Structures are given as C-alpha cells and as structure tokens.
C-alpha cells in the first residue's frame, strides 16, 4: 500500500507541466485569460509557445473580473492576463522579462506592460512598403499587492 501511494505521487509529479528554457530555468505552465475576439492576445500566447512554454488559453466573458481577482492596478491593465506560478502577468510581457522574473524570484505580485506598445510580443507591426518592423521602446513594470510599482525591464527596438 505504501509503495502504491509512492507510485501515484511519482506519476502525479511527472505529469506536472513545466518547461525548461535554454538557460535551464524551470518554468511552470502559463494560464492565460483573454476575450475570444482578441487577436493580439493569441499572438502573445504564440510568442510564449514558440519559446517553449506550455500555455492554457482560457477564453472568458469578463476579463476585468480576472484583473480584479489578481489585483492588477488599474493603470497597468491591458487586454489579457496570465498566471505563471505565483506571479501575475498583465499584457504583452516579453519572454525575456518572464525568464528574468522566474530566475530572480522577486517579492512582487507580477509584471505588466501597460497599454499595447508597438513591437511588444503580439503587437508587431509590419510595414507593407518597407517590410520592416515598426517598434517602440517600452517598460515592463513590476507591481505589488499594495499597488506599488517600479520599472522591472526596459525594452528597446
């Protein structure tokens, strides 16, 4: 009986979803929340999947309820939200910032990219005339449960 319990625990542990990046960082499954009509949200999810993360894509009627549930400050809200381990991810946060978050494990609630900056993952814009990308610099903001914010990363084209 003890052995069968051990076997069940090992089977459950082996089924836990996580990804290993090139840097060998253990990354838990991402649980994403978005509206059905959001195309840029799908592109952000593909950005994560293309970088080896497992993403559960939840279509929800009321994305604002998720933002309230995870205490995302109003001024940082964007079109989609996600949970990765104990952290909340809001908006078009790039994989590099997510990896940094999981490496450093700061005492924060999560990261956000306010608005929808051109060139952030999912917000790439291609010019038909020049076939080049139109990117802008943006900041990845860390936030705490109390609503305190600080710059976590600066992203430049």
Regions found by a protein language model. Give the residues of each.
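Short active-site oxyanion
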Residues: 29-31, 53-55, 85-88
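Ser/Thr/Pro/Gly-rich low-complexity linker/stalk segments immediately outside membranes or between
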Residues: 12-26
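Stable alpha-helical elements in mature extracytoplasmic
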Residues: 37, 44, 59-62, 94-98
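Conserved helix-turn-beta segment immediately C-terminal to the redox Cys motif
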Residues: 45-65
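Local sequence-structure signature of Cys/Sec-based thiol-disulfide redox active-site neighborhoods
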Residues: 23-51
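Short alpha-helix boundary/capping motifs
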Residues: 37-39, 57, 72
């Amino acid at each position: 009986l003890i052995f069968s319990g051990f076997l069940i625990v090992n089977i459950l542990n082996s089924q836990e979803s996580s990804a290993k990046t090139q840097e060998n960082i253990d990354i838990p499954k991402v649980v994403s929340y978005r509206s059905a009509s959001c195309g840029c949200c799908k592109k952000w999810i593909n950005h994560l999947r293309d970088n080896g993360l497992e993403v559960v894509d939840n279509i929800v009627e009321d994305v604002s309820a998720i933002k309230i549930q995870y205490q995302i400050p109003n001024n940082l809200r964007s079109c989609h939200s996600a949970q990765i381990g104990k952290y909340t991810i809001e908006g078009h946060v790039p994989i590099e910032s997510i990896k940094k978050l999981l490496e450093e494990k700061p005492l924060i609630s999560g990261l956000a990219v306010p608005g929808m900056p051109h060139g952030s993952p999912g917000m790439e814009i291609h010019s038909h005339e020049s076939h080049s990308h139109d990117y802008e610099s943006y900041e990845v903001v860390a936030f705490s449960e109390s609503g305190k914010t600080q710059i976590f990363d600066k992203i430049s084209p």
